[in-house]
Amino acid sequence: MIKLKDLITEAAQLSKLQIFSPGTGGKQSLNWKFNPEKIPTGRLNVSSMVQYGGMCHNKPVGIFWTSSYKQKFKGSAWTDFKKKRFPKWHSSMGAVFELQSGAKILKIRSHSDYMKIQEKFPLDASKKCPSGHMYMDWGKLSKKYDGFQLAGSTMSIPMLGQWDVESTAWFNMRKLKFVGTTKV
């Protein structure tokens, strides 16, 4: 049986460098520029997308997204995904962050990992969404952990279907230090 404590990843087990790549889908899809003066600070105010906007996506809102930075290739799983699948989302630069020690991050690798975490942080959205009884309460989870990492694709984790590739949702910005920008 998987225990929740087995899913906690220490900072040393994550990629030391993380990258934030501006730009996403939607109506305002464009080549956004990163402004270091606008990096969020401290513990972020996190909620669940289904609570915030009513959309049936099991994702946190109010967080800071990164993906493990591959220096040799000047990118990450997320920047590669955007280039290949959604070229309009691609931005030509990324902001690199160094992971600070002591970060407490939940790392999910499988559907059983997800179910174990969801059991501890349930959110009932069944009145609004299909399978709504299996949603995560991101606000509660964010108060106990610094981040939440999806270790790979969501293909085997149906409840995280809107997370396409390896990425980390950060709840506590004190665990990331901005080191500069790079072309991706």
Language model features by range: what are they?
Residues 1-9:
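Short acidic, low-complexity intrinsically disordered linear motifs used
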Residues 6, 75, 79-80, 140-143:
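Charged/polar, solvent-exposed surface patches and flexible loops
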Residues 12-52, 82-184:
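Active-site and NAD+-binding cores of ADP-ribose-processing enzymes
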Residues 50-59, 64:
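A composition-driven surface/loop motif
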Residues 65-68, 151:
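Short His-Asn-centered micro-motif
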Residues 70-87:
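Short active-site loop/helix that positions an aromatic residue
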